């Protein structure tokens, strides 16, 4: 029922121009402008609440271009070793110079310089440089679903699964991660996330204030990677936490559409 309601509202948004939707969204949800980009603010808000970016010696930024998550983490840990992986054939994804020119930041792109986490050679390079070594892994990747918002969960499934596998390869025991996720209505999505969180002592689903209220973006924050994973069934708890954010999203989508109708 929640999925149908959300899909209907997302379909209703397609009746309005992208420019109108952006203006209405900014009017409703954006606070006064700040000098920091939205991605920086999101990780700042996550870190203020959960303290995952402090005292980091080594971290990996997965699918992180243009690099605000990495920038924020390095600002707190100026002497850390930082690694980043991002697509190089998409101008929206490449790391900006202020990130990739830092002496303590190493970009991992693979032999073909693609930075594609689905490429086995890129995965191999990541595992060699970061395997079992990171205090923190940040995974903020997503697939562009413009015009296909109702397929966002399906279109992002493979990427999120790939990121979870890389997180488990790269985190040391006791390490933490921040993983962007979207909807989790499908059985395979919930099962994938259930299997993943069993590798951690604690986990929580969270939407930082700077994440736009009407979209499906949330973050799965996991603490203290275990040497041996649990065998717990977290499906009900995962569904409960997702449902909380579905209801908030419904409320904000209705606000957005009502404003657009004026």
Please give the residue ranges for each predicted region:
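A short acidic (Asp/Glu
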Residues: 68-74, 93-96, 148-150, 187-193, ...
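Conserved proline-anchored active-site loop of SAM-dependent methyltransferases
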Residues: 60-63, 128-148
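Short "lid" loop at the C-terminus of a central beta-strand within the Rossmann-like core
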Residues: 88-90, 144, 183-186
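Conserved Class I SAM-dependent methyltransferase catalytic core
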Residues: 150-205
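Beta-strand cores of modular interaction/reader domains in eukaryotic scaffold and signaling proteins
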Residues: 58-63, 83-84, 138, 178-180, ...
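Beta-strand-rich binding-surface signature
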Residues: 40, 56-59, 79, 131-135, ...
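Class I S-adenosyl-L-methionine
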Residues: 189-240
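Intrinsically disordered, low-complexity glycine/charged-rich regulatory or linker segments
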Residues: 1-130, 235-262
